[in-house]
């Protein structure tokens, strides 16, 4: 209660004293008397009768000066019908305040940077002694600042009530070594809510307001604060230092703000009604902790600090990992998937489904088989594991030291079975009618002794591969390297991002018999199973090859034969993200032998090269270049306008013979469309004469 309990109601300001009040609702037993009503008596009997003005508001409990901490005490003991409320008088600046000195230290410190870059800096200006622990009292410390002392936002630009305004400084409570402090903080973007002050009705004069008196909410769960502003602009004649109980004024060091700062305080900017000529006021209200509260707060402070340290260390580790990842991806030429628009996705899907497209997806640790215009088959999990074992075994066989260059032919028929129904594409053979591409982890072929590092332009492998058409079936040749015919160096090609589709493009250089080739890579990882995570951002989907049935086998049968020349291989290595997404893995890609495409196979061209001279090929040495010339000469023969279909070849059922009377050359095509042979007809020989007369060759 007030030091003057028992005296009659008075007007005026009691400097340095707290007049504890609790205004009444007037709903008291025995009547319906309103505070300041016509009865002229107090709203209730003691305690508290002398703490009200005739207008029905609490008398001034304390005086607020900018930068001076004031102690406000409210009684929890209420008489029946009493109502809550507290009242202060707001004055012009007072000397001997400590906030300005602390602000100077803070500003000087900020010029050198924040103590902790992610947190505000602080300088304390008061140390708070523990509360007495009187459960019948509500104790708050209150300190104010003029608007321009906390923000550069002018009064005219403050947002509507309930919104926040950016501020440079705030007055907060902190914990340090078990002690509660008041401090000024700054150095990072901060905001404070705006509240509107409203006029207080004069209960002695219904329909009017009390002059220069307003109320505003300044702290949650406590009554609105009544502010008397009549002397706000009145100069103070003297400035003796104001000492509040339990508040020790002292300027602290420049430190990082506490990790539980503002846990026990609330601050607002109070805006007064337009036309009041009262400037907005920053008010911070602080709850003083008792010894038990201090212990709990310090424990929370320590835990928050430890949590922050752990999170910071984790953030630093993540940042370092992201930096290392970015450097690694850049070195390997790997681009992260872009953010796709609907238009980009549609373009990408359209391009990947074009008839001549060869596409790979970015599924990590996968084995893939792609064919032009028919999508990609992807092996992962157990199937990919079995294929890996298969290649490991094959690698052991083909790299026998005492054996010279070897050709290891591995039939993929045991792994992939073409399964179109008869009449619905059963004559279409991958590797003959369709260009095919096979990819796997480069480490499968490199073996344990070879380290593949990002940034290299080529990688030496003990074996290289190519896809071929063998007896109408897709097969894979593994070729031992280490000689002039089969060099060990496999080129590493980097993907180039196409901005229109978001796809990556890898350009395979031209070789003898085949032009340059563009390979498309979808950079978006493909899920192993369909998922619906709620994220419906548009992304392109790699077309899936469905024309092939796949089953897992333990070990396909292999055959090993010497080989003298294979010419230029169509293979390369590129990099993609690994399964974890933090590293990269090298992918080895092989394509068809150019001579194993369409109606031709390298084997058959090699076998029938003895007739190459009949088609104008004078070089008797068989190699990729001469075999390509032989193939092209046969194609030229078939496309010549004077070439006609004439008869069949008696040794090949269902075959067709194409004859050109100008050159006297014939080319035999098997019933399945494959090239069988070709030579020049001698009309003077019996077989030549019979063919010309009967069409039977």
Swiss-Prot record:
GO BP field: defense response to bacterium; killing of cells of another organism
Motif (TonB box): 17-24
InterPro entries: Cloacin_colicin, Colicin_D/E5_nuclease, ColicinD_C, ColicinD_C_sf, Pyosin/cloacin_T_dom, Pyosin/cloacin_T_dom_sf
UniProtKB keywords: Antibiotic, Antimicrobial, Bacteriocin, Plasmid, TonB box
Signal peptide as annotated in the record: none
MF-aspect GO terms: RNA nuclease activity
One Pfam family cited in the UniProt record for this chain: Pyocin_S
GO CC aspect terms: extrachromosomal circular DNA
Top-level taxonomic group: Bacteria
Gene3D superfamilies: 3.10.450.200
Family, per entry: Belongs to the cloacin colicin family.
Comment field (misc): This colicin requires TonB for its uptake.
Its biological purpose: Colicins are polypeptide toxins produced by and active against E.coli and closely related bacteria.
Identification of the protein by name: Colicin-D
Upper lineage: Bacteria, Pseudomonadati, Pseudomonadota, Gammaproteobacteria, Enterobacterales
